[in-house]
Amino acid sequence: SFPTRRSSDLENQLNPDHERAHWVLLPGNARKQYLDLVKKQEKLEEVSSKSPYNYLEGLNPEYDYEFGVIACGIGYNYVKEADTDSCHIPVLKVSQYPLPAEEIRTMADRCGYVLVVEDGQPFVEEQVKAILSSDYEVKGRLTETLPRTGELTPDNVGEAIGWGIKRPFGKPQVVMPRPPALCQGCGHRDVYDALNKVAAEYPDARIFGDIGCYTLGALPPFRAIDSCVDMGASITMAKGASDAGVFPAIAVIGDSTFTHSGMTGLLDAVNDRANITVVISDNLTTAMTGGQDSAGTN
């Protein structure tokens, strides 16, 4: 018989909700559920204002400050690291959404402007602007006080705050760049060698890659794949290219990615009798993300 996992293997006990209206999202139920979410949002805002994970440091209500900082995640660490002179400015650390609106207003009332320090997209900055009126100046990535793109560093955070951090030494020139590469002995290498030999005979050949360590086939010395967008896209992009007249259109996908999100694309390609070649490069493991079991390795 086919082995199954018993419920005793689960870490937590079940806590089932038998109210079907919570789970059957017919239009009438969905409208009610959305109203419940709106009401929960008000409660979450109240919880956020009292959360120990959102806290305001260094604000003296009797003082006026040139600026204050709202920071989250690694941005908060960089603010503290850049604060080499223990400059006394208020810093609001935020750790959850919705943001603590009252704390934001309290700090903004005593500051000339607010600097938002966050990694990634300027989500918090946009939320802070929505909370504060146009009378308050908010700076951050959107104003390019911090770089609009790229990662935060202690250096660019320190520069934005105006503390002018100077590093005692630069990056050693003797350290040569080491771009990522497929491991020696990896079977993906042989796949790309073979594909390159075949593609050399077809000037219009296109090879569509997928998500996995085999994506490194786009780099030297192979330079074998022409695209990599998201998991499963290799097959659907190859089909679309073939439908548009590309020949040969070849998809390269790993075994784990194929079982994750490649099977539906292959089903559609077979159903439409698409003139494509699908290569499932099976390296017998989920190599890129930790070696965990998957339907492709069990």
Task: Write out the residue ranges for each language-model feature.
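Acidic, Ser/Thr-rich peripheral helices and adjacent loops at domain boundaries
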Residues: D9-R20, D226-A233, S294-N298
